Amino acid sequence: MRTPGHDVELAHGFLLTEAVITTPSHIRTARFCDSPETGTYQGNSVPDSPDMSRCRVAEPRQRSFNVLDVELAEGMPAPGVTAQRNFYTTSSCGVCGKASLEAVRLRTRFPPAGDPVTVTPATLAALPDMLRAAQRVFQATGGLHAAGLFTATGELLVVREDVGRHNAVDKVLGWALLNERIPAIGCVLMVSGRASFELVQKAVMAGIPMLAAVSAPSSLAVDLAVDAGLTLIGFLRGQTMNVYAGQHRIDRAASDHQSLCEPA
């Protein structure tokens, strides 16, 4: 399930975090199967000539824009037939500790551990309000998650909303990929919910050095953040936060309020 809109970004972000692509040039075309006239994305320099025989072309009144056909560039290996969201899960055990950490470690092309960026507690404390102010659909409905990508100085680069928080993050990362901001060096990913293992995995795959959430992280999310060298912040509310990993990126010297930032 996803909220319609920014679907090309969603596809790019999902394929990035599943280690299928690392640049926009790895995708030749992406178009809505049931709308041949509109909704086409063309790759950087490859003509748009998809094989529409695989797509059901609907009448105008039937177009739902719910199926996006993505064609990888020539020479790109196709994902396995069992590829699905969360490549580190299995039906028998779900997300499995050490195996999951190892899978992310082997797949990521942009490990964030070496990113020297630092962020002040005051900058971090301002992010939730900035994210909320940019959530237009949430303000109208109260029903969507959001993710936003910020610079280390607190500039909001992009925000995306979706009924699924994983989709919101994928849309943000797809935007970053299409705008040549992957790896997202020096950036902070802010999410409106909790920090799950899956969201930490997505941040790591995109080379993002800091992930902040308004709620708690899972224990496996903390383990992955420590293993990958990512700064993980939870319960970022008002003037308080918990830092679960990567405390060296919090510039406490720049703040007079040491109580802003408590190690977890």
Predicted features and spans:
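Intrinsically disordered, low-complexity regions enriched in acidic/Ser/Thr/Pro/Gln residues
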Residues: 1-44, 48-51, 59-147, 151-152, ...
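Structural signal for hydrophobic packing residues in well-ordered secondary-structure cores
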Residues: 19, 100, 108, 135, ...
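Cysteine/selenocysteine-centered motifs that mediate thiol-based redox chemistry or coordinate metal-sulfur cofactors
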Residues: 33, 62-71, 183-218
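Structural motif
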Residues: 67-69, 93-94, 146-148, 155-158, ...
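General structural feature for long, well-ordered alpha-helical segments within catalytic domains
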Residues: 100, 123, 127-130, 143-146, ...
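Glycine- and Gly-Pro-enriched alpha-helical subdomains that act as flexible
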Residues: 137-193, 200
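Conserved catalytic-core subdomain
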Residues: 199-264
